[in-house]
Amino acid sequence: MARTKQTARKSTGGKAPRKQLATKAARKSAPSTGGVKKPHRYRPGTVALREIRRYQKSTELLIRKLPFQRLVREIAQDFKTDLRFQSAAIGALQEASEAYLVGLFEDTNLCAIHAKRVTIMPKDIQLARRIRGERA
């Protein structure tokens, strides 16, 4: 293809280029003089989804053992004083408690999704328990 000669043409309207030299220079020099780097933040929801995947993969107990043990002993005091517990009994209670709570939160999440929400609320827990027949 043969080359053709370019002729100068008059511009027809269009935006004139703005002068950004001063602002660009100021923007580039400002962070370097401050020296304080902004900490990295993930977008809202990213960490929550990562935690959901992590805890769904794992099988370890999520409630700390000693606080749970204190709670069990405190509740048992109302029924009989000076009760003693085997460590396996406390472990079984904790396993059952966490399994119950996980199931309840799964049902609660379904109730929230049914209401076209992504945030669970106390009314979702109440509805889930009512459907299960745990509470009238």
Curated annotation (Swiss-Prot):
Record PTM Phosphotyrosine, positions in chain: 42
Record-listed Phosphothreonine modification sites: 4, 7, 12, 81, 108
SMART domains from the UniProt entry: H3
Residues modified as 5-glutamyl dopamine: 6
Gene3D superfamilies assigned to the protein according to its UniProt record, in alphabetical order: Histone, subunit A (1.10.20.10)
Effect of residue 49 to R: In BRYLIB2; uncertain significance
Positions bearing Symmetric dimethylarginine: 9
ADP-ribosylserine modification, residue list: 11, 29
Residue(s) carrying N6-methyllysine: 5, 10, 19, 24, 28, 37-38, 57, 65, 80, 123
Site-annotated residues for Interaction with ZMYND11: 32
Domains (record comment): Specific interaction of trimethylated form at 'Lys-36' (H3.3K36me3) with ZMYND11 is mediated by the encapsulation of Ser-32 residue with a composite pocket formed by the tandem bromo-PWWP domains.
Protein name: Histone H3.3
Organism: Homo sapiens
Lineage: Eukaryota, Metazoa, Chordata, Craniata, Vertebrata
